[in-house]
């Protein structure tokens, strides 16, 4: 059974309202970033890594429960390498390794061996943070170039505006959730991976709509551009909602049952996909409408403003 077939919802009729609404959301996101700065993870602010192994089978859930007794905020635990090998990251460069070692000694006595202890200085963490920002920026530029070549340059600009909107709004919501204590979300490599995934997902959603717009420009040449865009959104609505709903369903399961390791990434994806679906319909498409109708009307009345060919 297929849903949302042959719909005729006026998505573009209230585009000015959604433009203002989205602008307000972006302003709020920027203000939150300034006054509620994010908590950087060990990857970006420095810390210590302790790698160790057990000579018996140990559940990572039990190990995490024991390590939490050290009361180290921002502690990260994951398995690596062979069986019963684990890696702990702590933000406390000097005292963190000793706290972890003491807890392991109390809980497991001589049943573990320390493989290595590495320290990540603040300078290295800062360099990694800058590289992560460059990764996000280059991803946006690559997406714009791809869409510009596949469609037109204006479509690439519309996609970039939507992506920037997605990142700012998603980031703002995450800051609120973190500072309210609902989830402990840090800006680390997993966070950046989540943002990049959101960027790719948002662009994919936008490309589907843009592709239908291009098809309908050939099929409905006499139709007003705004109505043609609205038709394209309605025609792709079923695919958009079904894809978003199924993805969100999986993410909800990961948020509640994926454990601390996957919870943050899944939540970022959850928020980002909802925001990205919204921006594909109400941001990217509306910019293309503005460029092809309202902007051209203004230039027609004021030829001196035609600085963009």
Regions found by a protein language model. Give the residues of each.
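A structural signal for conserved, well-ordered secondary-structure elements
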Residues: 1-309
């Amino acid at each position: 059974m297929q849903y949302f077939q042959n719909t005729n919802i006026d998505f573009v009729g209230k585009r000015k309202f959604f433009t203002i609404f989205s602008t307000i959301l972006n302003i709020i996101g920027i203000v939150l970033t300034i006054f509620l700065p994010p908590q950087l993870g060990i990857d970006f602010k420095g810390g210590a890594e302790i790698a160790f192994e057990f000579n018996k089978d140990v559940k990572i859930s039990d190990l995490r429960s024991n390590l939490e007794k050290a009361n180290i905020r921002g502690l990260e635990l994951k398995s690596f390498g062979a069986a019963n090998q684990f890696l702990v990251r702590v933000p406390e460069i000097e005292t963190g390794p000793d706290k972890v070692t003491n807890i392991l000694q109390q809980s497991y006595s001589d049943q573990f061996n320390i493989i290595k202890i590495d320290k990540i200085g603040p300078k290295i963490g800062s360099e990694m943070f800058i590289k992560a920002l460059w990764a996000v920026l280059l991803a946006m530029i690559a997406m714009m170039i791809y869409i510009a070549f596949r469609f037109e340059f204006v479509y690439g600009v519309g996609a970039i505006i939507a992506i920037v909107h997605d990142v700012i709004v998603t980031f703002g919501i995450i800051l609120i959730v973190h500072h309210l204590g609902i989830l402990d979300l840090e800006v680390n490599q997993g966070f950046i991976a989540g943002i990049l995934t959101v960027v790719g997902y948002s662009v994919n959603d936008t490309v589907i709509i843009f592709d239908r717009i291009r098809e309908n420009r050939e099929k409905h040449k006499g139709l007003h551009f705004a109505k043609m865009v609205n038709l394209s959104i309605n025609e792709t609505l079923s695919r958009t909602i079904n894809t978003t709903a199924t993805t969100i369903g999986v993410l909800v399961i990961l948020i509640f049952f994926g454990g601390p390791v996957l919870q943050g990434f899944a939540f970022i994806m959850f928020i980002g996909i909802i925001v990205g679906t919204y921006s594909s319909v109400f941001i990217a498409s509306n910019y293309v409408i503005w460029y092809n109708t309202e902007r051209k009307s203004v230039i027609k009345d004021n030829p001196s403003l035609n600085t963009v060919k």
